[in-house]
Amino acid sequence: MVTVEEFRKAQRAEGPATIMAIGTATPANCVLQSEYPDYYFRITNSEHKTELKEKFKRMCDKSMIRKRYMHLTEEILKENPNLCAYEAPSLDARQDMVVVEVPKLGKEAATKAIKEWGQPKSKITHLVFCTTSGVDMPGADYQLTKLLGLRPSVKRLMMYQQGCFAGGTVLRLAKDLAENNKGARVLVVCSEITAVTFRGPNDTHLDSLVGQALFGDGSAALIVGSDPIPEVEKPIFELVSAAQTILPDSDGAIDGHLREVGLTFHLLKDVPGLISKNIEKSLNEAFKPLGISDWNSLFWIAHPGGPAILDQVESKLALKTEKLRATRHVLSEYGNMSSACVLFILDEMRRKCVEDGLNTTGEGLEWGVLFGFGPGLTVETVVLHSVAI
């Protein structure tokens, strides 16, 4: 008879969890940041709020965002005027929209990732789906399983309402699933649509206005598994370790509340300061076991909560400007897509490394770090190992 220990040993993979494919998708509707203040104040019937509009213009100018993608078109907003008010009852309209669109956008990214992976989707054993947009039972994980035609026995995990740190969370979960289930192939999907947070401007809630200037829609998908099949599955990054922590003295720094008016956000001004003040502790805990203390020797993938966070982290750690290039590029081209952002940055980094003829997927370097920042204030830290190109 087999012992429990023997059975458990046979269940475990031998090598580290590995990202084997990445796919991304956005809605078709592209919004230029330079034109957005005029559009936003017009569509929300707020053009009389001239001082507030000037403030919003300055926010958009400082955002370092060039364009974003949004499911909400002018036509949709005209059909749903309560979405354009500051706090009108609108949850039903928002939910009805996103419970359909979030899995659909997730399917686009997942289809690309599965195609790059090159294996039949019947080999997918687990699905991790993450969104801050829309809640139903059965959830977006079930809807995506149906849309993709995955096996009914796929083991699903649905993550709702995590916020911007969750791109790190899904990697942590996928790593544990892949390494503790021999032969597992985990489809990870983050799909975010801002229809839950869109609302008109108000003088008393400027942090909501910050969100209107930063957030965009997008979905990203990965295939994660251990022990890639040689010549068949092509590793992109290895997931070496993953940690999560709540920053000290950060209660209420980032809050989100899903109510009748939709999802409202509250941000304290000191969010960039809280993150930059505590980030070195997370780095030390993650990299001390590897004997690494030079943060410029790493490749960097940081959730781009906004330019102020990136600037303060860069300054605090004396990072070279090029360290956050991929992060700033994704912020510029897509805005803040919450949980999907860091997965877009992984894709951008490996793409640029191939384009520039570098010898690893991590900008020619061996080790890297991925950070997720979000409500809590919660920080996810993932240690990455690059792969030779």
Swiss-Prot record:
Subcellular location(s) of the protein: Cytoplasm
EC id: 2.3.1.74
A molecular function (GO) term: naringenin-chalcone synthase activity
Reaction(s) this enzyme catalyzes, per UniProt: (E)-4-coumaroyl-CoA + 3 malonyl-CoA + 3 H(+) = 2',4,4',6'-tetrahydroxychalcone + 3 CO2 + 4 CoA
Tissue: Expressed in glandular trichomes. Detected at low levels in female flowers, stems, seeds, leaves and roots.
Highest taxon in the source lineage: Eukaryota
InterPro entries listed in its UniProt record: Chalcone/stilbene_synt_C, Chalcone/stilbene_synt_N, Chalcone/stilbene_synthase_AS, Polyketide_synthase_type-III, Thiolase-like
Catalytic residues identified in the record: C164
Single biological process term from Gene Ontology: chalcone biosynthetic process
Main location: cytoplasm
Keyword terms: Acyltransferase, Cytoplasm, Transferase
EC class name: transferase
Chain ranges passing through the membrane: none
GO terms for cellular component: polyketide synthase complex
Family annotation (Pfam families): Chal_sti_synt_C (PF02797), Chal_sti_synt_N (PF00195)
Family according to the record: Belongs to the thiolase-like superfamily. Chalcone/stilbene synthases family.
Function of the molecule: Chalcone synthase that can also use isovaleryl-CoA, isobutyryl-CoA or hexanoyl-CoA as substrates, but that is unable to produce olivetol or olivetolic acid.
Record protein name field: Naringenin-chalcone synthase
Organism: Cannabis sativa (Hemp)
